[in-house]
Amino acid sequence: MDYSKFFSTELEKLKKEGLYRNFREIDRPIKKFPKADEMQGEEERDVEVWCSNDYLNMSQHPEVINETVKTLLEIGSGSGGTRNISGTSSYHTALEKKLAEVHNKDNALIFASAYTANQSTLWTLGKKIKNLEIFSDELNHASLI
């Protein structure tokens, strides 16, 4: 099989169907919210971003930035691994404990994204519950459809 030709053809199909993903380069300078800089080739243009997960612009709040810098200086960057090997820190555990407490639950588990949370949940339920049927419609999050 000519894999190069096969995958080139598949990529072209995605492009023709409008399903090929092009990632937009967007930089969000501090004190510019909700405006941002979008790079299109060599050109930069101002855009407004209302689709990020940083709804309240907390990532640019001075206290959040200061605490982030403080934590980076204490423990460095990155978890060192996935959660199931060496990537669970006391910070993860403390956050999960606080989330469980706030929501009056026994435990909580944080995920890197809503997508991974949804995928993990559906996969686990489907594997553990015999004959489970999952119904979804176009109003659900894209990761559930």
Where are these regions (language model features)?
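Conserved N-terminal alpha-helix of the aminotransferase class I/II PLP-enzyme fold
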Residues: 66-113
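N-terminal "arm"/small-domain region of PLP-dependent enzymes with the aminotransferase-like
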Residues: 2, 13-75
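Short coil/turn connectors at secondary-structure junctions
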Residues: 44, 104-106, 129-132
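Histidine-centered active-site/metal-ligand motif
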Residues: 61, 92, 141
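Short glycine/serine/threonine-rich phosphate/pyrophosphate-binding segments
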Residues: 110, 115-121, 142-144
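Conserved PLP-anchoring active-site segment centered on the Schiff-base-forming lysine
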Residues: 121-142
